[in-house]
Curated annotation (Swiss-Prot):
Pathway where it operates: Cofactor biosynthesis; coenzyme A biosynthesis; CoA from (R)-pantothenate: step 1/5
Origin superkingdom: Bacteria
Cofactor binding mode and count: A monovalent cation. Ammonium or potassium.
GO cellular component labels: cytoplasm
Subunit structure: Homodimer.
Positions bound to K(+): 90
Residues that hold substrate according to the record: 69, 73-76, 145
CDD domains: ASKHA_NBD_PanK-III (cd24015)
Keyword Cell wall biogenesis/degradation: no
One GO term of the biological process aspect: coenzyme A biosynthetic process
Cofactor: NH4(+); K(+)
Protein name as catalogued: Type III pantothenate kinase
């Protein structure tokens, strides 16, 4: 069984513990006897997968989650299905936070990802068009513009997560997940959360 998470930039694949990503218009041919089960938040990229691999199974409708949140993305639902208690932080193009308690989704929120923050600053003024410096000192107030931008971005994200998690265990995933996880003692980085959630659902369905 091959699992696929179709996002807004790449298609992420999972097979026997291995994860890799492919561009939608440069997909490698998979074995015909290996069924592909996928979730998708991008219809255009989904069509790319189906054009080259017509015998795929969309499991979006099977990813159910007990929640009052309206419009929760299927990728976030799948990640939430992987745990019963804790806070899931998916730090990618956007940074999402979802709180799980006894298998119930309590709620969540969305913040810009690091690259989105950088673009927002550059839209304000060319002077603010600076890269986010991950090594900026967060213990002292900055004394220059470049550090001030990085400090403001990172500190706002970190403090928001700390305020949400408090004593709860944190599960980080996504491209910048490993970076943010190092700021928290009660955190682990697991880039397989979405696929673990998919597997849990599929075990009951097939």
């Amino acid at each position: 069984m091959l699992l696929c998470d179709i996002g807004n930039t790449f298609l992420h694949f999972y097979h026997k513990g291995r994860i890799w990503k492919e561009k939608p218009y440069a997909l490698t041919k998979k074995k015909e006897n290996l069924p592909i089960y996928y979730i998708s938040v991008n219809e255009r990229f989904e069509r790319c997968l189906l054009a080259s691999h017509p015998h795929c199974v969309n499991v979006n409708e099977h990813i159910e989650l007990q929640t009052q949140y309206v419009g929760l993305g299927v990728d976030r639902k799948a990640a939430c299905r992987a745990i019963d208690n804790g806070v899931i932080i998916d730090a990618g193009s956007a940074i999402t936070a979802d709180v799980m308690q006894e298998g119930v989704h309590i709620g969540g929120y969305i913040m810009p990802g690091l690259e989105a923050y950088r673009r927002m600053y550059s839209d304000i003024s060319p002077v603010l068009n600076r890269e986010i410096e991950p090594g900026v000192n967060l213990s002292i107030l900055p004394q220059n513009t470049a550090d001030a931008i990085s400090f403001g971005v990172l500190k706002s994200v970190i403090l928001m997560i700390k305020n949400t998690s408090r004593t709860k265990k944190l599960y980080f995933t996504g491209g910048d997940g490993k970076f943010f996880a190092r700021f928290f003692e009660n955190a682990i980085y697991d880039n397989t959360l979405v696929f673990k959630g998919m597997q849990k659902v599929l075990e009951k369905q097939i």
